[in-house]
């Protein structure tokens, strides 16, 4: 297992280097002079020259890339042009907010999706099977922004059950050390604020997790049906084992392997694709952070944000690969 993990880690090195090349090249793909694009058409030649010197844009490409990699090796993502603050310090609260939202959304998607898929396969062609697969089809097809707006209208505006915006109560803000509000409030014993944080997570979490939930449900059903029709399951049934034992002890473990792939991909997609949900719910996440940087032409932030999200996506897929080898020891490639 350790040797397999080391091989997978070594294979990540060229992938990560490739990502740095792509993210670094973004600023060089801007038509015209990048410094003038950042400062605007009315900028003076001296201001443009000063910014080129500050960003190192007057150096050859390979020299700039070498300096960029040197900074990355020391944990320096650069400085925001808009706030003039180190990006490494500035980006974490936004990233933590998106991580917390993504975790909640995926917990919702996995619990509902996996169990719906299992029962649908177990009760194939029943009313539950047809209903759950219809809901899954609607979930895959439903626009996130429409679902988010309906949630706000029904549960926040009409019923008043849940908050529609933000991460916490602005009148009683949460003092966080890690940026993960639920974790921090549990550790500090502020359970009233824990519930407040969870209430703020419910609507955006469901909106963000609906599509992954539908995909996971359909994949789980398909995988379970394939496993339930295999020879070894027929043997287990012939021995008189109960349906619960057959499903959860013998079939589920093998059926989860393709589902893990979907979970890994969807988790990575949510991290980088939550911008619409974050905008509708005023969630201060990494998607909104990058979007605001695009509006302000803050290219160092754009580079760093894309690199961080891409790196997390790759690490999630590494984790899924390691889970494969744990669930099925035959997978050693």
UniProtKB/Swiss-Prot annotation:
It is a multi-pass membrane protein. It holds the Pfam family BPD_transp_1_N. It comes from the Bacteria. The chain crosses the membrane at residues 10-30, 99-119, 130-150, 197-217, 256-276, 300-320. Keywords: Cell membrane, Membrane, Peptide transport, Protein transport, Transmembrane, Transmembrane helix, Transport. GO terms for cellular component: plasma membrane. It is found in: Cell membrane. Belongs to the binding-protein-dependent transport system permease family. OppBC subfamily. Probably part of the ABC transporter Dpp involved in dipeptide transport. Responsible for the translocation of the substrate across the membrane. This is Dipeptide transport system permease protein DppB. The lineage of its organism: Bacteria, Bacillati, Bacillota, Bacilli, Bacillales.
